[in-house]
């Protein structure tokens, strides 16, 4: 059995709704609160426990994207660019 190409990571400091919005801006369509489908890919979003130091709490989102290799090779760098720029 061959598995589909995929990537996943956990991002701190971004709410789930904003991660979902970024994926929609990159050509996806929201099909559920935690799923965005794009051409050749599907993303699953999961809110994970906040990172906390003292009274400071930072939200985190786990992202798992699978699909065809060509679609992921286009999506990943575009998404990473949005995640490193303040405000997308």
Annotate each PLM feature.
Residues 1, 30-37, 55-58:
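Short, ordered beta-strand-loop transition motifs
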Residues 24-34, 86:
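Short secondary-structure junctions
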Residues 55-88:
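C-terminal basic regulatory modules in eukaryotic proteins
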Residues 1-22:
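Terminal, regulation- and interaction-focused segments at domain boundaries
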Residues 37-56:
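A short, structured beta-strand/loop element
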Residues 11-15, 49, 67-71:
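Beta-strand elements of well-folded, non-transmembrane domains
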Residues 5-7, 39, 59-61:
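A generic structural signal for short beta-strands and their flanking turns/coil linkers
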């Amino acid at each position: 059995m061959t598995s589909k190409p995929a990537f996943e990571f956990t991002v701190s400091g971004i709410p789930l709704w904003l991660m979902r919005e970024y994926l929609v801006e990159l050509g996806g369509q929201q099909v559920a609160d935690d799923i965005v489908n794009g051409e050749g890919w599907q993303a699953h979003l999961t809110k994970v426990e906040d990172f906390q130091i003292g009274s400071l709490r930072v939200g985190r989102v786990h992202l798992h994207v699978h699909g065809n290799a060509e679609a992921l090779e286009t999506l990943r760098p575009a998404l990473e660019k949005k995640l490193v720029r303040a405000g997308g």
